[in-house]
């Protein structure tokens, strides 16, 4: 339950972060890509007619969470710190740094990139829930969807980075991606610590 509750905060906060990246970006074609990405996340795509937060709410039902439980959850201190970090990166830094910070977190779900580690985060978490909780992949619509959706999202902004993150900009973007991954690790570690305390 802790995982899904904190994930719901992460997913909702990303909408703000992508909006900051779009607001900072002067390139109309990139803004259009961001809006396309956000339409899939917030409105509808092939995985949900109601946006991806709906997938988390549906996934919560088999483990005893109501929509209210998910929507009214409070952040762990580490979740709050990570969300503040991403918010600052995407609002105060350049649009390319913000784009890199957001895009790298999509890569965490991509089985193609992380096959040597047993797959992306969504696949590995889903497998744990199947093995330890006796659920099926049909009970896990969020992780099932993100195994596919984030393949497209992983690839979506690579041409943009290849075009605009050149010269000295390349190192800046790589550093932003590293910092974003550090935030992601802190976010995940906080969830793990909270789960250990109740087990």
Predicted regions and their residues:
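Accessory, usually C-terminal, subdomains that scaffold auxiliary metal cofactors
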Residues: 134-177
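Short, charged, amphipathic alpha-helical segments
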Residues: 5, 32-36, 73, 144, ...
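Acidic, carboxylate-rich catalytic segments that either coordinate divalent cations
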Residues: 164-199
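Amphipathic alpha-helical segments within well-ordered protein domains
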Residues: 18-22, 57, 126-130, 158, ...
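Active-site-proximal alpha-helical scaffolds that flank and shape metal-associated catalytic sites
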Residues: 32, 38-142, 182-186, 193-197
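Long, hydrophobic/aromatic-enriched structural stretches that serve as scaffold segments
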Residues: 1-26, 30-33
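Short acidic alpha-helix initiation/capping motifs at coil-to-helix transition points
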Residues: 9-14, 50, 117-123, 151-153
């Amino acid at each position: 339950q802790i995982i899904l509750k904190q994930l719901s905060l992460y997913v909702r906060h990303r909408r703000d972060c992508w909006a900051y990246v779009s607001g900072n970006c002067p390139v109309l074609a990139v803004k259009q890509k961001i809006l396309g990405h956000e339409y899939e996340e917030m409105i509808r795509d092939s995985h949900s007619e109601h946006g991806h937060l709906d997938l988390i709410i549906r996934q919560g039902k088999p483990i005893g969470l109501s929509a209210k439980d998910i929507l009214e959850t409070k952040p762990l201190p580490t979740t709050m710190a990570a969300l503040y970090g991403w918010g600052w990166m995407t609002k105060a830094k350049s649009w390319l740094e913000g784009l890199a910070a957001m895009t790298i977190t999509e890569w965490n779900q991509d089985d193609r990139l992380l096959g040597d580690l047993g797959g992306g985060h969504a696949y590995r978490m889903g497998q744990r829930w199947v093995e330890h909780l006796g659920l099926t992949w049909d009970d896990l619509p969020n992780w099932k969807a993100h195994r596919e959706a984030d393949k497209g999202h992983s690839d979506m902004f690579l041409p943009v980075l290849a075009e605009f993150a050149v010269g000295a900009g390349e190192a800046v973007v790589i550093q932003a991606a590293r910092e974003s991954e550090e935030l992601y690790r802190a976010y995940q570690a906080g969830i793990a610590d909270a789960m250990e305390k109740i087990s």
